[in-house]
Amino acid sequence: MRYIILSVAVCTLAAAALPVQADPFSATLSGFEEIGALNNATGAILTDGEGSLRLNLDERNQTLNYTLTYSDLTSNVTQAHIHFGKLHVAGGIFVFLCSNLGNGPAGTPACPAAGGTVSGTITAAGVLSVPGQNITAGDFDAVVQIITSDTAYANIHTVRFPAGEIRGQVTHGNGG
């Protein structure tokens, strides 16, 4: 009997020690997905620019790890974000990925100006308020709901296209 209880206890501890698997999401960014500024749509952008965003959402630890890679844009990158909006609809910025304007939350990394890769981890401290879309600053649960409901998109803004040059809808999986 003692052996059975000990075996159950060891198995329980071993299971508790297993790392939580983060849920993968991704986006493929192009000018063809771009729509322009909120309430000032410009339509798609003809550009050679392209990018990819890889996300790993860990609901238990409330972290969103990301890697954003981009190249061949028409001008230097000013900032990149994740917005709350359906496919082909503009939405508010709720998370910064990088910025060269000094306007992101503390710890926001700089964007590689001409192209490259930037990585980071988003926590509740990096969640912005979007009052018009009922997002409260610091609400990581909102990030989870938005990402998992396919209503998030990544957008890279450049000097030439300040409203955004390339964009991609975030979807579940690694395919983008």
Tell what function each PLM region has.
Residues 7-15:
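Bacterial N-terminal signal peptides
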Residues 20-80, 84-176:
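Metal-centered catalytic cores of metalloenzymes
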